[in-house]
Structure formats: structure tokens, C-alpha cells
């Protein structure tokens, strides 16, 4: 679908050859693969003084600027929550500061040495789906609301990825973990975590590396000392994907309170959504920021975040910083997309294999590594069922575009789409730069066959054809699809 659409963009692409630019911000989950896809389609981002330098060309990209159009897209990986705020305001000054380990998001050779130099913001990335609060914020405010100025909010899936658990490799005392099971095909270690183990660690009840549950799973004691669970502090779409899965998967898991207290307790994910209003009963649910006990002593209602199992938690802002903290903390385990760990990242930390619903129900004895193929199988269970009306509603895409507990053979159980959020109505800049055309041409490349290998080498999978069909149906809808030259009665975004 994407290949055909890209070929059909001939007129727009020819007009874009004058060399143009587009700018975005948001999710860190796909930051590396986005940079490589952008550099493959257009000119390579060079970075600038004091900022990350150029990123190596993807192995499955023939050369930089394969389109021959030159120009560039720059993307600042600042987290999904920040991206959403930037899009609503259409304000580049709200873009946060990316991690020092981020791919280049500036390019001094085109006069962009900081996000303050961006020529507007045309799109954002988010792994955290649009929710009702997002829609209320978009539609509220009368003539000053985003909807009144920029038209409808549009949300489309851009990539499929696994949320992988990377671990330090040493126990809490600094001794090398004693991992006995074989490494499965596509994995990077033999460390096996059942659903019960994952839920126990995340809820703070499995706190030691010699916990009997872990010992039984791995054919012997892994080590001793504390397990430190490292999480994100910022508004993170990766956290949404993790918590959306754990809320569903951990609901009926139970076990000992901790290694010294045999009282059986629930391992249901306990940490509540930080964004919920205090007037609403606080419940654990998939969210981009939750009330982790080390980050927030109390929730937004003033109630203490009780860590009854005594688990050890630590935190960092951004995927790169989280991985760095796991790397330097004995006994640590944390979560990020697969491209931050082995085998995708050379010299990276290893990842654990976890149990899927299929493996539990069928008693297969298998544990799934966080591969792009496993993530792709998980999202194959999310099939869109839209009509012309529901297709225009981002909440419909949110409802149908998640797979919190996939039940299919070979599926990796914590995976999801990373989304592009964009405007319906764009304006052509006074400097004649039509950023929407530039961005749309890149989107066509992302959905085409030429991008498949780039996704896969980074540990990601391409959005399946059934979703691409719906994306282009929306794009080709004259009433609800994006308009590159503005909409009647709308200021239009830039």
C-alpha cells in the first residue's frame, strides 16, 4: 500500500524538490529507527556543537537521501507526554530537552542548532494512545482550542515494537548472575521470567535475585541481593505500553508478599495513573506516568504510595537515561524498546524472555524473547473495524490499536504501536516551505517496502497492510483527512 502511495505522490514530490524541512518531537521509543528512516529518505542530520552527532546509516538503506530530494526532517525525542503538549499548542518552545544520548535532533548546516530554531512543529510521536482527556484538551477553549485553529487531531500507527526488559547482568551484590537456561532463537540471554515473576517484580513483591520463584524458573539460584526495578519518570509512551499490558496480565497473579513474608498477596499492578483527578477513585490503568513509590511519596489525593513488599525502585527520564542507570546499577532491570539492548544494540545489555498468554494456557514451557517478529504477531491480534465516521475519531484508533494480552503462538506479550499524531489543517509557511508535503512523502516511505529492512534491523516491525489501508482511507477523505494547503475557517498549523 505504502509503495503504491509513494509512487502516486509524483506531483507533490516533484514540488518538494525545492528542498524543504519538517519538524517533530515526542516518543523516545522509536527515536533511533525514526532517525535512520529520515536520514535514508532525505539528507542526514548532522547535529551541532554540544549536541549528538550524525547517526550511522541503516544497513538496509542504500544511501542517505535515497529520494534525491535533499531537505531534512528533524525529530526531538522528549517523551510522548511532552510531545502531546507540544502538538496541542503548536509551540516549539514547549519541546523538552532530549537525553544526551539521543540521536541528532539538530543540524547546524541548515541553521538549526537547538529546538528553538525549528521552523514550527508539524507532528509528534507517541506510544501513549490518544485518550479522552487528550480529546477534551483538543476540543475545549472555543475559538482558541486546537480544534478551532488546526482542525481534527489525527492519530496513525507508525511502527510496531516490543517493550523489552534489559538487565544489568550482575546481582544486587555485584556478582555475575548465574543464568543456566539456553538462549532462545532471537534472544540475547537465557533469563526466563514467568508472568507471575514479571508481575511480582513490578509490584515490588519479588525483591531478591534468589527468590524461589526465579530459582525454579531458571534451574538454580540466579544470585543474591536486591532486584532494582528501573522505571521512567517522564510522561512516557513506553510506560503506557508496559502498564497497559501489566494491568491486564497481572490481574489474577498472586504470590508471597516477599522473601521473608509468606503471606499470599495480589501481584496485580498496584501503581495508579498520575493524571487521574483526585475526585475520581484512583485505579491502576495503562498510563504514561504512574505513582511509582520511589518517585511519589503520595498520590495526587495525598495517600501514601504503600510499597508493602519492600521492592527497590529507581528512576530516570528518557529511554537512554534509563538504560544508562540499569547499566551502572548492580541488580537492576528496566524497560525500553528493543533497539536499546542486545542483540540490536552492539555492546548493549541482555534482555529477559517472558511468558505469553499462549504459553501459559497451552503449558508450552516456552518464554518469548523481545523480537520484532514476536511484536508483529502480538499486534496481528489488533484488527481495525472502521466506517467513515469512526475512522475520523482518534479514540476509535486508540481502542482498536492496542493488544494488552495477545493470545497467539509466538507473540511477545508486551508490545504495541508507536503512533504519529498530526494536524488536519496545515498552512504553507510565508517562506514557501510546505512542511506537510515533506512529512507526508516521508510517511509514504515509512509504509513502503523500502523501509521494512530498516525497521527489522532496529528490532521493530512495519505497520501491517490492514492498518495501512485505513490510514490511506483517512488521508484520502476530503472531509476528515489532512489538508496540506489549509482548511476553510482554520488558521492551520505550522
Residue ranges with predicted function:
Residues 18-494:
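Flexible loop/hinge segments at secondary-structure junctions
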Residues 1-17:
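Gram-negative bacterial Sec-dependent N-terminal signal peptides
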Amino acid at each position: 500500500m505504502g509503495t503504491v502511495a509513494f509512487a502516486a505522490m509524483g506531483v507533490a514530490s516533484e514540488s518538494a524538490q525545492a528542498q524543504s524541512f519538517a519538524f517533530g518531537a515526542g516518543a523516545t521509543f522509536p527515536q533511533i529507527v525514526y532517525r535512520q528512516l529520515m536520514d535514508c529518505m532525505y539528507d542526514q542530520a548532522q547535529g551541532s556543537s554540544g549536541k549528538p552527532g550524525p547517526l550511522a546509516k541503516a544497513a538496509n538503506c542504500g544511501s542517505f537521501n535515497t529520494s534525491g530530494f535533499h531537505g531534512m526532517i528533524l525529530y526531538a525525542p522528549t517523551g510522548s507526554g511532552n510531545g502531546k503538549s507540544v502538538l496541542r499548542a503548536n509551540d516549539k518552545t514547549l519541546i523538552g530537552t532530549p537525553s544526551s544520548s539521543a540521536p541528532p535532533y539538530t543540524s547546524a548546516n541548515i541553521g538549526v542548532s537547538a529546538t528553538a530554531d525549528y521552523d514550527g512543529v508539524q507532528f509528534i510521536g507517541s506510544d501513549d494512545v490518544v485518550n479522552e482527556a487528550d480529546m477534551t484538551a483538543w476540543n475545549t477553549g472555543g475559538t482558541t482550542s486546537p480544534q478551532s485553529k488546526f482542525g481534527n487531531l489525527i492519530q496513525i500507527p507508525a511502527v510496531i515494537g516490543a517493550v523489552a526488559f534489559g538487565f544489568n547482568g550482575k546481582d544486587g551484590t555485584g556478582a555475575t548472575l548465574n543464568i543456566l537456561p539456553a538462549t532462545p532463537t532471537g534472544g540475547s540471554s537465557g533469563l526466563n521470567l514467568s508472568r507471575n515473576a514479571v508481575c511480582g517484580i513490578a509490584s515490588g513483591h519479588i525483591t531478591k535475585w534468589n527468590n524461589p520463584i526465579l530459582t525454579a524458573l531458571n534451574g538454580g539460584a540466579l544470585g543474591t541481593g536486591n532486584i532494582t526495578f528501573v522505571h521512567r519518570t517522564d510522561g512516557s509512551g513506553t510506560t503506557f505500553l508496559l502498564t497497559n499490558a501489566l494491568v491486564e496480565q497481572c490481574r489474577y497473579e498472586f504470590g508471597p508478599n516477599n522473601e521473608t513474608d509468606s503471606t499470599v498477596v495480589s501481584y496485580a499492578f498496584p501503581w495508579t495513573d498520575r493524571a487521574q483527578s483526585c475526585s475520581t477513585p484512583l485505579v491502576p490503568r495503562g498510563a504514561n506516568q504512574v505513582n511509582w513509590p520511589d518517585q511519589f511519596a503520595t498520590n495526587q489525593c495525598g495517600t501514601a504510595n504503600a510499597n508493602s513488599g519492600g521492592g527497590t525502585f529507581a528512576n530516570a527520564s528518557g529511554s537512554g537515561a534509563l538504560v544508562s542507570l540499569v547499566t551502572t546499577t548492580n541488580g537492576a532491570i528496566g524497560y525500553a524498546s528493543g533497539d536499546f539492548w542486545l542483540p540490536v544494540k552492539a555492546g548493549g545489555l541482555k534482555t529477559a524472555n517472558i511468558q505469553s498468554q499462549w504459553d501459559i494456557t497451552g503449558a508450552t514451557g516456552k518464554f518469548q524473547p523481545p523480537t520484532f517478529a514476536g511484536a508483529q504477531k502480538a499486534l496481528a491480534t489488533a484488527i481495525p473495524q472502521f466506517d467513515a465516521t469512526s475512522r475520523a475519531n482518534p479514540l476509535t484508533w486508540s481502542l482498536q490499536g492496542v493488544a494488552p494480552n495477545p493470545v497467539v503462538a509466538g507473540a511477545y506479550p508486551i508490545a504495541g504501536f508507536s503512533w504519529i499524531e498530526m494536524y488536519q489543517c496545515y498552512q504553507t509557511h510565508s517562506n514557501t516551505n510546505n512542511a506537510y508535503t515533506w512529512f507526508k512523502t516521508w510517511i509514504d516511505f515509512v509504509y513502503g517496502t523500502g523501509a521494512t529492512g530498516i525497521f527489522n534491523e532496529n528490532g521493530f516491525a512495519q505497520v501491517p497492510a490492514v492498518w495501512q489501508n485505513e490510514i490511506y482511507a483517512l488521508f484520502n477523505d476530503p472531509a476528515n483527512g489532512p489538508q496540506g494547503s489549509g482548511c476553510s475557517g482554520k488558521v492551520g498549523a505550522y
